[in-house]
Amino acid sequence: QLAKAVLTIVIVTSSSEEKLARAAALGADHGINYRQHPEWSRQVLEITGGRGVDHVIEVGGPGTLTQSMRSACVGGHIALIGVLTGAADVVPTVELMLRQQRISGIGVGNRRHQIELVRAVEATGVRPVIDRSFALADLAAAFRLQQAGGHFGKIGIDYGPAPGTIR
């Protein structure tokens, strides 16, 4: 949604046609089912006329990084924001160098970044998609849902009232 708010062409990947349809309803221009197309970078290159994309938001991690690199253009940027496929694997460094690409590990950010993000969300009217919320006591169930990959959007954790507040 944020990418669409700044007039970007958005290509999303998912293992689920239902999730791809939901992403399209939220503004995604193209959807690729990576189970049907394990070498999904080929579809990205087809969509972009062989050029590749400027930016990849990589949530899969090691298991999908090579496809993300092959989807990005020469000089493209890959923002690694998740590691759903595992913590470590081989990075094809020669391919990375030949493509002159950059990979950045992106964390949650500091307070200033969060404030800027909230302002951007408010300015664009984007509404974050929250699949489900769990009480803190059900944290294990939230992690199981995330691991199963059945959610669409964010999984929230309700910590309860802030200390000193009355509910």
Question: How should each PLM-predicted stretch be described?
Answer:
Residues S14-R22, A87-T93, H113-I115:
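Short, glycine/polar-rich helix-capping loops at beta-to-alpha or helix-loop-helix junctions
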Residues T66, R111-R167:
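C-terminal hydrophobic helical "lid"/dimerization subdomain
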Residues D54-I57:
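N-terminal Rossmann-like NAD(P) cofactor-binding module of classical short-chain dehydrogenase/reductase
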Residues V74-I81, V90-R132:
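Rossmann-fold dehydrogenase core element
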Residues G63-C73:
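Rossmann-fold NAD(P) dinucleotide-binding segment
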Residues Q1-H37:
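Mid-domain Rossmann-like dinucleotide-binding core that forms the NAD(H)/NADP(H) cofactor-binding site
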Residues Q36, G60-G61, G82-V83:
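Short glycine-/small-residue-rich Rossmann-like dinucleotide-binding loops
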Residues P38-G50:
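Short amphipathic alpha-helix with an adjacent loop that forms part of the alpha/beta core around
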